[in-house]
């Protein structure tokens, strides 16, 4: 794997500093270009896919984080606006938030950046299990129903949950390939988390997925 020591140091300096900064001072994080030429063979990855609820507090290196987010919800055909996962009528209604110690970010796949949302560590709100508040990354999948105008409320709910499931499986497969631990969860205090995230009424939290290294 190509190493980028300068970026690595800069990334974690940013993560360490933003805890003392105001929300307006929180800066976007430009992710490294995803590496799409590595990984284990598919059949081996399927054999290794598993759920884990034991995580170390070790941070994910910048390249691994970038690769993870691209695998989860990046554009694999950017010229036609298509992603690594399908969505109902290509609504692309899911927003993927990234909760880390330094704050809450929104993954912008088009610019390959993390856009700052909250200068707070809200990892503890991303689930009800103890490991959630100390694991390095919690992905939060939020449906934006304003992008699904033609569907009924019931259809929006069904399709968005299905689309989030595709993202979750991509994360599972990536983690199996990279030797990471992960668990896909619906056990969330959704009203409390939605309030902290300042979501609109037509946005709905669906699932959260914890990612990190297994506990040593």
Positions of PLM-derived features:
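Bacterial N-terminal signal peptides that target proteins for export
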Residues: 1-9
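Bacterial N-terminal signal peptides
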Residues: 9-17
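N-terminal amphipathic, basic helical "cap/leader" segment at the start of enzyme domains
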Residues: 21-135
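Short, small-residue-rich loop/turn micro-motifs
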Residues: 35, 141-145, 213
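Small-aliphatic-rich amphipathic alpha-helix that forms the alpha element of a beta-alpha
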Residues: 49, 68, 96, 137-148, ...
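Short coil/turn connectors at secondary-structure junctions
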Residues: 133-136, 202-204
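A glycine-rich helix N-cap at a beta->alpha junction
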Residues: 199-216
